[in-house]
Amino acid sequence: MPTPKRQLGDRGEQVAAVYLERCGYTIIARNWRCRNGEIDMVARDGDYLVFVEVRTRRDEYALESLLMHKRQRLVTLAYHYLAEHDVPETTPWRIDVIALTVVGNRLVVTDHVMAAIGEEGCA
């Protein structure tokens, strides 16, 4: 049985997926894994391939919980995904972060930061 923290994270990813679809994104993959870790979601936003990190917290510090080592690992994971899926080098991509916070009994998207992790991946 998943821990309460894992259950909250799973709920957050479900809410984030619905949010992205309502914003016009197409979800390509969820919980994509390789030996280096996991990407919560891979989506399309127009011409962009978007790697999405979902941060779900019970307090208002969801975005602040994304530490530097995790940011660096997300960039590494994005490169692994691009290579494994033979994505053309000309394909523009970015890493977005979606923050959700528990408000009462609901999960609320509090932030959606596009290209949140530097310019490393933008073609």
From Swiss-Prot:
UniProt organism field: Chloroflexus aggregans (strain MD-66 / DSM 9485)
Family the entry assigns: Belongs to the UPF0102 family.
Protein name according to UniProt: UPF0102 protein Cagg_0930
Gene3D superfamilies for the chain: 3.40.1350.10
Gene Ontology molecular function terms on file: nucleic acid binding
Pfam family, one: UPF0102
SUPFAM superfamilies (UniProt xref): Restriction endonuclease-like (SSF52980)
